[in-house]
Structures are given as structure tokens and as C-alpha cells.
Amino acid sequence: GGGVVGDIGGLAAALYMRGIDCIQIPTTLLAQVDSSVGGKTAVDFAGVKNLIGAFRQPRYVFADPTFFATLPPREVRCGLGEIIKHGALSAELFDLLWAHRSRLADGELLAAVVPENIAFKAEVVRRAATEKGLRKCLNLGHTTAHAFDLTDGKLSHGEYVLAGIVFEAEFAKRYADGDAEYLAKLEELCLTALGGMPALPPAKDAARLARLDKKNASPDEVVLTVPVRKGEYRLLTLSYDEYAAGLEEIRNKFTAGGVQC
């Protein structure tokens, strides 16, 4: 199945008898490039994303691209969220996606980029099995994505990730000396995959939920993994007030540009 099935099954395998073997057979694009790889399984609890979970590597992962033919367009967009996130962390993958930005949902392209994505994430996980050090790069775009998701939950995970990358690219321009030309291209990739910025809930509500994110050291700050240059990221710590004000300003920027948020 998809990410939910993989998370529930993987967590059950990690807990039952203190851990039994698990085989992941992901059937969605998102699950193939992200959730089935890395051994991180979790469920939401008390209104917080992925609060209860475990790290346990699956025995095998079988990723078959023929499943893509069964997916509706929205499930493809969902998977593109994690694919473009990996592109923000890998210069080679970014160049591939940018060169083919007019056909991001093409089946042949997806079949070609899925192995690249799996290899990229597997290497990150090999070097940092838990959510410390290098593996923190995989949180890129996710703080804001999770905050919007918890606020209204009307979009898929990957759609929120695409929006989250756009917002956090804007934070990188403002607070992390991000390369404006590169970040504009990254935002264009995300918006192309989305078909435009979707309707999003009020920024003030999302900001309040972002301060509950487990990556934060205190409720008075928000920690983001932001893209700064091609293949480079940075951990950016903002005060809650900075984050809340920035989220509102960025949302207004897209609204003023004629894009509904």
C-alpha cells in the first residue's frame, strides 16, 4: 500500500515481540521514494505529527514502477513533493528535474527518477540512521508542511510538502542568505508540480502548530531545514514571532501575486 499502510505495518513490526522482520511493498509514488526507505515509522498522536514511532529497517523493499499506472493525478503530485525535496538536496537530481520540468508527471520520467531518489535517501539513511546529523536534511519543507496539514488536512502530504518548500525557500532568502536565482527555480518546480499554490489555512493558525513541532528546542522558537543553494541546506532557527510574521507575509505575497492561498 501507500505511506499510511507502510507506517502502520512498519510500526507494528517494530513493536510486536520487540521487533520482527517487515517487508515493504510500496504502491504509491510517495511511498516508493520516501516512506518505505529509511526505517522511520510513526503515527500522529494528540494533534502532533509522527509523535509515536520507531526506527526499524525493513528486511526488503520492493518498488515496482508499474504501480504508477494505477495512480490518480493527485497521488502523483503527492509523490512529487518528496522527489522535489530530494532535488533540493541533490544538485544532480535538481538539474534532472529542472531539465524536464514541463513533464514532471510523465511515467517514463518518474520511472527514471525513482531509483535516483531511493539511492539518495538510502545513502542519507546509511550515514545517519536516526533523526540526527545529516538525516535532518530530510526535514526540508516539512515544518511548514506539517503545520498547514494539521491546521486543515485538506491536501495530501506531498502537496503540503511542495507548499512548505516554497515557504521555506522564502525564509531562506530572508534569513539564510539563500541564492535567490536558484530558490526561484526551486519554487517554480514546486508550483509547476502543484499547478499553482493551493488554498491554505490562515498563517496564524499554522504558526501556532509549528511551535509544537518535535524538532524545536523550545516553544519560543521554530527550527526549519531550508534550501540555500543547489544541493545545500541549512538548519535555521527563528523566534516564534519571526516565523509567525514571516509565514503571514509569505502567504500574502502569493495572494497579492494572484495565487489563492
Report residues per predicted region:
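C-terminal charged capping/lid subdomain of soluble metabolic enzymes
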Residues: 81-84, 177-261
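Catalytic DNA-binding helix-loop module of base-excision-repair DNA glycosylases/AP lyases
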Residues: 8-12, 169-170
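Catalytic-site beta-strand/loop segments enriched in glycine and acidic/polar residues
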Residues: 1-6, 141
